A protein has these predicted regions:
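N-terminal "arm"/small-domain region of PLP-dependent enzymes with the aminotransferase-like
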Residues: 1-16, 306-315
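Conserved PLP-enzyme active-site core in the AAT-like
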Residues: 5-235, 246, 327
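Conserved C-terminal alpha-helix-loop-beta "cap" of PLP-dependent enzymes
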Residues: 235-326
Length: 330
């Protein structure tokens, strides 16, 4: 497949009107690179684990970070801004992750989508963790869905790729969704340069799309198994996984996420730092490619903090659990 065919395949996968591929280190960088969030716009985001990316990437834009992914928090922070769905703007942007932020929060995208349209806001969803397999964010109310393709490419992409998908604007009974129409017009007019992929890169992405459902189900299933193991581990506290009833968004997640509850688990260590745990683990837990088959750990609050975020691979969860257990007890 060439780039256009891959973009069309991704649009079909994401239920989108159109999709674009671009190179970017992560989703906020891709949104900035598009240039559709302009000086004079207001960008309201729930991204407490990615605040620096929003502080640096949107010069001239009024950026406000909210402490909750609720529609009420976004609406309150948007009061007084005279937003428009006209292409000229000014535009009000709402940004959330389908799974993200500290605690792996799952926002009610349906409620956010409704509230965004009432406020004349454009809802953008970072769908990287849940993926198009695990969350149909455009159907739920987003006008733009952005997804870093590390996991889609099974960790084999030679550079960081992001897919940008725009919602269909045709609603039932021939009504037009003004928010989606505005987002499409902005994407069409952003002047994004023609994107090129090498034959190897195109092959990696094509094979990734072909095997996506099977692999993502394996990631989700292993995450649940590891979450249940960690929930019973006496060396761990404050486990956060949307699939457990203890998670604050569990009820919402059952209606937002599909095929499970995503590949990520977050937890805090008792009486030791994340760096100390990494010292006791094989290097592959830290250095394996993002989105690949090997379970990977990260430190969202730094190595001196106690918070660990686990992204389940497709490797044997019994072996992963045994390795973690040994490191936690030594």
């Amino acid at each position: 497949m060439d780039v256009q065919q891959l973009e069309e395949a991704w649009a079909l996968r994401a239920g989108a009107r159109e999709a674009r591929l671009l190179e970017a280190s992560h989703v906020p960088a891709a949104l900035s690179q598009l240039g559709i969030v302009r000086p004079g716009d207001r960008l309201v985001a729930f991204a407490d684990d990615f605040a620096d990316a929003f502080a640096r990437g949107f010069d001239g834009c009024d950026v406000a970070l909210v402490g909750s992914p609720s529609a009420e928090a976004f609406a309150a922070t948007s009061e007084g801004f005279d937003a428009s769905f006209d292409v000229e703007g000014p535009h009000l942007w709402w940004f959330v992750n389908s799974i993200g932020g500290f605690g792996l929060r799952v926002p009610d995208l349906r409620a956010l989508g409704r509230a965004a349209r009432e406020a004349h806001a454009l809802l953008v969803v970072d769908n990287t963790v849940a993926s198009a397999f695990g969350c149909d964010s455009l159907r739920l109310g987003a006008v733009l869905s952005l997804e870093a393709l590390d996991r889609v490419c099974a960790g084999k992409a030679p550079r960081k790729l992001v897919a940008v998908s725009v919602a269909r604007s045709q609603l039932k009974r021939h009504r037009v969704d003004a928010a989606a129409e505005c987002a499409h017009a902005l994407l069409e007019g952003c002047g994004l340069a023609k994107f090129e992929l090498t034959a190897d890169e195109a092959g990696v992405l094509e094979r990734g799309l072909d095997s996506l459902d099977v692999r993502m189900q394996a990631h989700f299933d292993r995450a649940r198994a590891l979450a249940e193991y960690l929930a019973a581990n006496e060396m761990v506290r404050s486990l956060r996984y949307p699939g457990l009833s203890s998670h604050p968004d569990h009820a919402v997640a059952t209606g937002i996420l599909e095929h499970g509850f995503g590949p990520a688990v977050e937890f805090d260590l008792i009486e030791r730092s994340a760096g100390e745990l990494f010292d006791a683990l094989p290097d592959e837990f830290r250095t394996s490619p993002a989105g690949g088959p090997i379970t990977r750990l990260s430190t969202p609050r730094g190595k001196q903090g106690s918070t660990i975020r686990l992204y389940a691979g497709t490797d044997d969860p019994l072996i992963v659990a045994a390795t973690l257990d040994n490191a936690l007890r030594n």
